[in-house]
Every structure is written in C-alpha cells, then in structure tokens.
C-alpha cells in the first residue's frame, strides 16, 4: 500500500501495439465542437466560445498527446486525444475551467499516467482501451449517475473542499511556521462525510508519532467535540464567517488525526487502510464498509462494483499510486461512455469525467520495471452512517495468498504459505487445506495457526503445512488452501494477490509431480489470431488473441517465450492477461521484441504464469508452432553465440572443473573488433564477477572459441560473502561503449555454485551432532546428520520462516535421486564402511549415467557420504 501525499497524484499504466495516425488540431477542434453540440445542444456557448488553450506533449518528446479545449470562462473543458488509437475524448467537464499552469497536483499526476500509457501504445508496447466495450452498461444499474457531491441535494451548495484555509487552521504548526495541510486522504473522507452530515461527534482517542520530517512528533488526544454541520458550507466563499472557519477546521483536524496523518511542508500523507478503521470506529459509519485493493478484482468487476456503489448514492473513497506516492480523491458519478466523475479535493478545480485507464485490462500491469500503476488503486466502499437499527456487520477479513513454495518428498508434501492482510483485522489466522481426490472425495483438514497484523503496512505472515503422502490417491489430487479468522463461521479459499488467482495445487501420484493451477482457468490461443514478423537477431513484433475456455477468471502476469527442440528458451515479453471465463473474444496480446536472440528455425510459442521462478524452472503452456525467419543484416557485424550446456551444471568452488566453452560466429556483413567478456551473474541479482575478457577480431563468417575461467579473478570468486553459493548465469557479451551487450543466440547457461563438501568443516567421519555448512547459508546448504537421528524428520526453514526442505532421515543402501523442489535434488547415501553416516545434499548432478542399483551417478569425488 502506498502512502498518499498532498502534492503527488495518481499515475495510470503503460501497455501494448497498433497502427494509426496523429489527429490534427483542426480535426481535434471539430471533435470538441461535435462533443459539446451533442451533449449540451441548448447551451449557447457550446461552440461559439470554444478555444484550444493547451497542447499536452510528452516531457522529452515533441509529439502531441492531447489537446485541451476550454469553453467560455467556466463552461467546461475537453481533452481530445492527438492519436486516433485512443477514444476521441479522454476527459471532460461541463463546468469549470482547465488551467494548465494551476491544475491540481493529483490531476497532473493522473495526466502523467495518461502520458505514459499513450506513449506505450504509440511505441507499439501496449494496446488502448476499446471505448465501445468501456461503454457497455452494467446490468440492472442506471446508465449514468450525476456527480453526487455537486447535484441533487447539493446542487445549490456543491461540496468543493480544499486542503488549506479554512480547513487547516487547527492543524499542527510545522517548524517552518507553515500550517500543515489537511492531506488528500482526510479531504476525501471529509467531503464524503459532509455529504451525509454525519456523525454528531467522533469518539475514542488518537495516539501516534509523526516521523515525516524526522522530528518524531507525538500526537495524542481525545475526540468528542460536537460538529456544527450547519456551519460547514460545501462551496467556500470569500466572506466565510469565523463560526464556519471554526466548524470546518475542528472537523478536519479530527479527520486528519483519526488516520494518523503525517505532516510536512510539502504535504500531508497517510495510508488508505486507516480510512476503513476511522470511518467505522471513530466516526460511526456502518461496520459493513470495507477497504478493497484493485488487484483483488478483475477489471470489469472492479468497475461494476464502483458503479453499484454510486447507484446506491454512496460516494467512493478512491486512491491510486504511481509506484512511489499517490493521491486520494472522491469518485461520485459515472457516464454511459465508460468515464467516471472525480472530485479532486482541490476546491472544485478540474473536477470532471475521466477514464480509469487508457489501456486494455491486459496492459494494466505493464509499467516501469513491469511494475504497473492502475493495479495499485484502492477504494473504500459501503460508506454510509450507522444506526442503532442497522449498524452493519464487519465483513470477513480479506486474507490473500502472497507466495507459495513446496517441497515433495517420499513422506509428505510440505507447503510454505505466505499470506497478506488487506483488512484492519489483527489476530490469529487459521490455515487448512481441502484435499480433493481423483474420485471427487473431499476432506477439509485444519493445519496451522499464524498471527497477522495490519498497522501502517499490510501485515504478512507465513504458515507451514505438511500433507502426508498417504492421504493422496493414484491420479491427480487437488489441494486448495483455506483460511479462517476469529468470528468467521466458514473456511474461505485463499486467492492469490500477485496478479493471478492461483489457488489450487495439483499433485499427481505416484510420480509425485506438483503443479500450481488457477482452478478451472486456462489460457488458449485463438485460431487465426497469431501475427508476427519474427526474424532472427532483429527487432520484431508479435500479436495474438488468447482466451479462457475454463469456468473461472484467469488473471496473471504471463511471460511469453520461444522454445526450441532442445528445450532452450528465448524471452519475448510479459503481459498482464485478464480473461473472463468462456469469453471467446479473449484479449489481444501485443509484444515488441528488441533484438530477438533466437536463430532462424522452427519454435514453439509458449507462455507461463509462474512469476516467482526462473524461466528455466517454470511450467510452460504450449500455444502454437512458429517460425523465425533468417536475418537480413549485412551492413554491420553480428555476433552469435552457441554453447553445449542446456541443463543446470553443478560447480564446486574449491576445485572447479572446466566450464563449457562459447563459440562466437560473426554472421554480419562487416568485421568485428572489440572486447568480449564472460561474466557470472547471480540469479535474482545484479551481482556478477568477470570470468574472461579478451579483445577479439572476427571477420565475416569467422568463428572463434572463448572459455570461461571462474578463477580468473580469484579474490572475487572465492569470496562466499560477496558471491554466495547458488545459481549463476554464465553470460557472454560485448563490452559496449556505455553498457554491455549480450550476444545473440545461446549466450548463456546456468551453473549452481557450491562450496565443496570435502573441504568444509563437516567433512570428518566422526559427526556426533547435526552440522550445517555454510551457516548462515544463502541458496544452498550441506547437512551432516549422525545415524542416531534415523527415523526423524529433517526440516529446514529460511530466516523468514518459510520451509525449504522436509524429509525423513533414513539410512539407505544406495545413492538415490529424489526431487525436492524446482531448485535441485536430494542425495542420500548410507553405504557401510565400518561406520554408518548420512549426509544430505541438495544439488543438481552433471552426470546421469545409469549405474543400476546405484541409481543416478554422483560426480566422482563428491559423494555426499564422505566415509564411502
């Protein structure tokens, strides 16, 4: 959840590709005239006083994004898109004025979001919304709702509050001598409460510290002053009376303190989750109101929910963030064209109708660093006064699945379940699992209880669940993770918050294969929709329509790639896919690929929703066979790499074997001369060390070989703190003028770097207690266990409490390979040599020669059992 500030606004999102052209000024002016003439034909100034006052351009580009037209002095404004791929009109108002020099900061942020979205479309990285689909009505609801805070009972005195005088006269005086602003969160809350003129007075206390300016200021007090609603005008005039100033500032002081407002000269901010608590407990609104995060709902369901609230005459508290900061405001109306009316909390300035986003649902997760913005929106709904007869019922806490890891052994499936709290609940969360056998039999099994909190940031916790393999039947077994909190009568399924509704785990027996699924949600390529110009080593584009033939929603950040017959993967791009069940229209996915790494040839187009795994460890869905054409570059050098290593290779730090070499071929039309380097890059990190550097000259068609040397920089390679054991990418690249440039083709392979067991502190034969090395460990650990522990269960947890390994300790007669996770394997050896000992080692083998009863071969000299 993002902290909301006075001076920073909401940024919407960036996304996918089309062909179109710019809109001229004259055409934009005609669009504006037609719009006002159609929507308000009786207004005399509809077209006569229309003028273009501002052209919005991208900060570092000269392209116009939209034109701003004002009508008369204060008869409304219009934002007309300067590119015909977008809706003609992207924002408008029938009263007021748009002043580019004095626009509210939150509107400025909103338009900055529009800018990023529009540039993404114009650059072929995103697709715009379809205005026809946006305008589809919500069943059983009015086609439009006039702005609640400005019409109806408020028509003669619209609610147009601000954050400065007279609302902040009782707010803290800052060290600079400036009176603190009320803050956008408090202003949005205050306007909604002014709509109801409720409560008579607040109750309870406030007690918190303000660390915004580093002064650690303590604020505490008791609520209880009676509010003089009759002296709180909606529209503040110049001649406001002292009584009105006191009434407004008393109320807004309480609102700010109720949400633990943090004050500073540049603005005041707090968390939206405090709004739910304050309205319910301090200001006596119905207990049934609730905070909801955008990522919990599909796009259409989100908009339908907001429309339903407004149809019930309930304004919606709305907030959004751009990845760092954001702004809160009030959504109080909607129109048939798919736009919503926003009151920015800036004295009425620029209040109007805007789209929630300009990008289709699948584009909403594509932002800077694939972060996205629109999905970081929040609302509080169900805001209405409580009464003794109808106080409302506190909704069940919203607990979500935030992360899931598993370990499958012969004895049990161990699950590490990370949960996140999107409510004001604080207490115990009970976790259970529902097991559905292949024959349909279901059982619900309580498993573990974990505590969770919510203060300031959303609380997180981790629970570990062990499911004995004896509970599984032959075939596909399905597991759902359930939760229940104090006061909940029934178990609820955990829904995944990370852009996907992953809530099922499938275990196939007797193989022991484990897969995650999205219930009955699938992603399938629509026949005839695939279009591309894929060419080896070139910039290219791909578009396709995917749909969901299942019965449940599919929403996940999907990675698309090419896979060759060897199993090598070539990354294409990522796209947030939001698919309604059974909707054969599906969603168009557009990808822009810069410098495709793949060679010419036949590939399989694949995708995966596994967000927390390395590409090589993910489960891939096959979509279609696809051909990559030959490259046609002849004017410059073009370096293509190849290497023989496909599988993960285990490398021992103390005695590293020779690593596979890279072949580099110049397939371009000119001689190459420059530096080539090989580096080892830590997975999930930017940490790397150099394993080779060489100045190389390659004529057209010439091939040379370069071999990595891990010990080339021994001071780094041997530093286990800087470069801990774990997975590394061995990458060959050109040292560019500014940044290194990865070669084309097969420019990397993976190794697992481990500290050699034979040189560690646990290599001796007389192990009398459990020993781990290294300790602390990062990605990899050796465990030495004396035979007296045979029959016990070994479990390893990381520092965050997540289970990484669970296995029964046994003395066996041969070395065996057992899958423990997507990261590696467990090797056990209990050969007798006068003394029994057991050593457990998680690693991948680089030799799979069949040895009969010995199972998978353990690399020579590195048997985990050092007494062998």
Swiss-Prot record:
One of its GO terms (molecular function) is cysteine-type peptidase activity. It comes from the Bacteria. The active site is at residues 184, 327. Pfam families: Inhibitor_I69, Peptidase_C10. It is an enzyme of class 3 (hydrolase). Belongs to the peptidase C10 family. Appears to be specific for arginine-containing peptide bonds. Possesses hemagglutinin activity. This is Thiol protease/hemagglutinin PrtT. The lineage of its organism: Bacteria, Pseudomonadati, Bacteroidota, Bacteroidia, Bacteroidales.
